[in-house]
Design a protein with these regions (language model features):
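Short terminal alpha-helical segments
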Residues: 1-43, 98, 102, 125-129
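Short, charged low-complexity linear segments at domain edges
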Residues: 114-115, 168-192
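Short, flexible, mixed-charge glycine/proline-rich loop motifs
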Residues: 118-126, 194-202
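Short cysteine-rich clusters marking metal-coordination/redox-active sites
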Residues: 131-134, 207-210
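Short functional micro-motifs and their immediate structural scaffolds
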Residues: 136-139, 213-216
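Short cysteine/histidine-rich metal-coordination sites, predominantly Zn2+-binding motifs
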Residues: 146-157, 210, 222-226
Length: 226
């Protein structure tokens, strides 16, 4: 007896995860008034009618492509300031997920959903600023939340996709209403302070100590220190 997987079964699994990812992207774009929701809607229609992923793959590229999207109020999207880091990290994760699945489908292979989630985007870099005059480093609330989103969302997206509960996850990100967010933010602030890095809720890019100009600074966290 052959040990090869049932072709029909694995294609149904491919269909399910691909459509889940696209539907989640469409909902996120719809909720935030992003015009790309129409493109994703066409992706879904084309795949369901012809099995082709070419329209979706055509969204990725250079300037003006889906790669350039940033969900924010400045771009006339429907979103609040606090939700921006979560919505954008979720969007990037869903884009990577749908792009990866589309390429597997195009190659006629079976999706290994666990492997896809393992290999998907995970930045885990904390961005802040450092004074060009006195050298004082600091992080802001928005960048702290962006880091936390890159840390917490992968597991949340995986669970939502596997359980077909992406609607609930999107709704939570757009508030944001993330489990243990306050505690996790305080943990990062404490780690930063232990490393001599200040924290500010302000959007001001000037030095908190001396008011001078600053430059972008990046830190990696190992879980215990920065």
């Amino acid at each position: 007896m052959s040990n090869l997987p049932n072709k029909k079964d694995y294609k149904l699994e491919n269909d399910r995860y691909y459509i889940y990812a696209l539907q989640a992207l469409k909902q996120l774009f719809t909720e935030t008034s992003c015009t790309w929701q129409k493109w994703i809607e066409t992706d879904i229609e084309e795949y369901l009618s012809t099995g082709s992923v070419e329209h979706h793959l055509g969204a990725y590229g250079g300037m003006g492509s889906i790669n350039d999207i940033w969900i924010c109020k400045v771009n006339n999207h429907t979103i609040n300031d606090e939700a921006e880091p979560w919505a954008n990290e979720l969007m990037e994760y869903l884009k990577c997920l749908s792009y990866g699945i589309a390429n597997i489908i195009k190659a006629g292979k079976k999706i290994n959903i666990e492997k896809i989630f393992t290999e998907s985007r995970s930045r885990k870099i904390l961005t802040g600023i450092q004074c060009e005059a006195c050298g004082f480093p600091q992080i802001h609330k928005r960048e702290t939340d962006s880091y936390l989103a890159s840390l917490l969302l992968p597991k949340m997206v995986k669970e939502a996709v596997l359980q077909n509960k992406t609607e609930e996850l999107i709704a939570a990100c757009l508030i944001p209403d993330i489990p243990n967010l306050v505690e996790e933010r305080e943990r990062i602030i404490k780690l930063a302070e232990q490393s001599g890095i200040g924290f500010s809720t302000s959007k001001n890019s000037c030095c908190k100590k001396c008011g001078s100009d600053t430059r972008i600074k990046y830190w990696k966290l190992d879980g215990k220190r920065i």
